[in-house]
Regions:
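Extended, highly charged
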Residues: 1-75, 81, 132-199
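Internal mixed beta-strand/loop scaffold within catalytic domains of large alpha/beta enzymes
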Residues: 71-106
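Flexible loop/turn segments at secondary-structure boundaries
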Residues: 85-88, 107-108, 114-118, 175-178
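Short solvent-exposed loop/turn micro-motifs enriched in small/polar/acidic residues
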Residues: 91-93, 199-202
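Extended active-site and interfacial segments that coordinate phosphate-rich ligands
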Residues: 93-139
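Conserved small/polar residues in nucleotide/adenosyl-binding loops
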Residues: 204-209
Length: 209
């Protein structure tokens, strides 16, 4: 069993709460992850906490004391339980990820991951600015297919894109032969298809501001 530690980071007064603080934490986490091979950060956010492990659902509350505290409160909780089918099970690969839970396999994963990595030379973000190089590579190819999609969504959101838009781009509805779409919807999907290949049903949530 891994050694599990929990820490709390105080928000600097000059940093706004919410996504601005989370963006700083994202950069800190990526720098730490790349400096320590045998560690995994389940979550580092001012708005969400991810509890994960190789458990049955009813064992989760027994393992983490936080979840037994009657004063512990949350607006929403996502729970996922499924054994690995195409990767070896491990604590860090357990769901939830930081943005999504996903029940299934992404058949296009290798192509999606390779193309995300290939784009890194031309990536830029007005929100990450000169910190962008610290979070590369965007996709950790050692993770599961779901984790790699989670990496991509997290990067898009931290770069300033609203989560619903990021999801519509990465996981578009079947639009090519859909005659019910109006021209604006068709133009939307066609435009973003030039920038992002579709990933394969997902459950995701955006934390409260």
């Amino acid at each position: 069993m891994p050694c599990i530690m929990q820490g709390f980071i105080e928000r600097p007064k000059k940093v706004e709460q919410g996504i601005d603080f989370d963006r700083k934490l994202y950069i800190v986490r990526r720098v730490f992850e790349q400096s320590a091979d045998d560690t995994y950060v389940a979550s580092l956010s001012s708005r969400t906490i991810a509890y994960k492990g190789m458990f049955l659902v009813d064992q989760l509350r027994l393992f983490f004391p936080d979840l037994q505290d009657p004063d512990y409160d949350s607006a929403i909780a996502l729970v996922h339980s499924r054994f690995s089918t195409n990767t070896n099970p491990s604590w860090e690969r357990a769901h939830p990820n930081r943005f999504i839970v996903h029940n299934g396999e992404i058949n296009t994963i290798r192509g999606n991951a390779d193309k995300m990595l290939a784009r890194e030379e031309t990536m830029e973000s007005s929100h990450l600015k000169n910190q962008l190089h610290k979070i590369l590579p965007v996709v950790d190819t050692r993770g599961s297919d779901s984790a790699m999609l989670d990496n991509t969504l997290e990067f898009l959101v931290m770069s300033g894109m609203p989560l619903p838009l990021a999801v519509m781009i990465t996981i578009p509805e079947p639009w090519t032969n859909n005659k019910t779409l109006d021209q604006d919807e068709r133009d939307f999907y066609q435009y973003y298809a030039t920038m992002m290949e579709p990933w394969d049903c997902l459950l995701y949530t955006s934390p409260s501001p």
